[in-house]
Each structure stands twice: as structure tokens, then as C-alpha cells.
Amino acid sequence: MKNSAKKMVSFLFVTSFALGQNSVKTSNLAAVANGIPIDTLSLSPSSEMLDEELYWSIVENSIKETKTQEDQEIYLIAKIEKLTPKEMIGFRLRTDQLLFDTYNENLWCAAYIINGGCSDGGFEYFRCWLISRGKEAYYTVKNNPDALMNLVVKGQENYEFEGFWYVAMNAFKNKTNKELFLYIDYDTFVTNDENYPVLDFSWNVDQPKTMEKICPVLYKNLWK
């Protein structure tokens, strides 16, 4: 009787384990069938940025392959979707780093002149637009805001790209059905908008000459 009971317990344990394993396999297969990469099921928060050269190659190919900002946004999302979930997070983190590195009063002055005004949000989307213009444009303007004059397009009134801010999040959501920000290790990755420095502005829109001092070329050609 005892042996029979032991055999029954063993049978139930093995059966339950097997069913559990099959359930996991079924869930994983369902996830893959729905376009959710299996590695997101155990994806840990990350602070690792995407390789910078890979990042810029994606951005610069988007410039070459599209003619409008809307098409560029669609292109970027499609290309980011082809990355691994961790790389998608890395794309967002690399963007955050580039935004962080250009959060300064001189570039804000340039953005104000070129756009005829610039709020907090507008400055964020202006820098997204700058990133979307490629590596050379980004670093040239980062070092010399007046170089923005070389990117001015006749007839264009707005130099912002709000959609760029969301491309990695949208791609991640499309492929994993999860929110990208839940997988960022904020304890380690601190170069984000929550930690922007407090700026001490030396220019004032009510005193235009202070803006001219920072961006003489932009001021001369665009200030009205």
C-alpha cells in the first residue's frame, strides 16, 4: 500500500512537472508567434547604450532612404524593430546620452533663434531633430551652435522632431508588447532628462544683443 501511494505521488509530481514545462513551452511559442522575442520574457533592466557607430548608421541610413520627417520616423521604427530587445533599449539610452550632452544654454539660444522661440519641450524636440540630421551635423553644431546656419532649409519654419523621441519606445512596444522604460536601469544610467543640469542663462530674449553675442551668424541671418 505504501509503495502504491509513493508511486502515485511520484506519478502526480512528474505529470505536474511535465504539464508545467509544456505550459512554459506553449507560452513561449505563443509569444514568438505574436512577434515577442523570447528573450524579453527574462529581460533585465539595462544601462548599456547601443554601439555608437551602429546607432549613427541607422540614423544616417534613414536620412538617405527617406525624404520627409514622417517617412524617416517610420523607417527608424522599422529598423529598430530588427534589433534585439536589449539593443532597442540601447538605442533609447544612446539617444538620451546625446540629448544630455547637448543640454546647454548656448544651443538653447541657437534653437530659440532658428525656431523663433523655444520652450522646454521645444528644446528637447529641437535636439531630437539635430540628432536626426546625422553624426557630423550633431557634433559640428554641438561644438559650434552657429553652424546650424548650414542646416537651414529655405521655406522651413520648424526645426523639431518630436516623433524621434519615441521611435525606440514604439519599436519596443510593437515587438514585445511591453513598455521600454520598464527595462531601463535608472540607478546606473543617469544621463537622462531627470538629471539635466540647472542652466544659468547669460542671454535674454528681452535683450537680443545677448543672443547675438552667443550666435552672431544665426542672429544676423534669422533674428526678426
Question: Which residues fall in each region the model found?
Answer:
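Hydrophobic/aromatic-rich, well-ordered segments within soluble, folded domains that form packed cores
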Residues: Y112-K142, L148, V153
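An amphipathic alpha-helical core segment
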Residues: L151-F201
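Bacterial Sec-dependent N-terminal signal peptides
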Residues: M1-N34, T40
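Short, hydrophobic/amphipathic alpha-helical patches that form generic packing surfaces
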Residues: W56-N61, L93-Q97, D101, G121-E136, ...
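A glycine-rich, hydrophobic loop/mini-helix early in the fold
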Residues: I77-G117
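N-terminal leader/targeting peptides and immediately adjacent processing regions
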Residues: S23-P85
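Long, solvent-exposed, polar/charged low-complexity segments
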Residues: N28-P37, S42-S44, W56, L180-K224
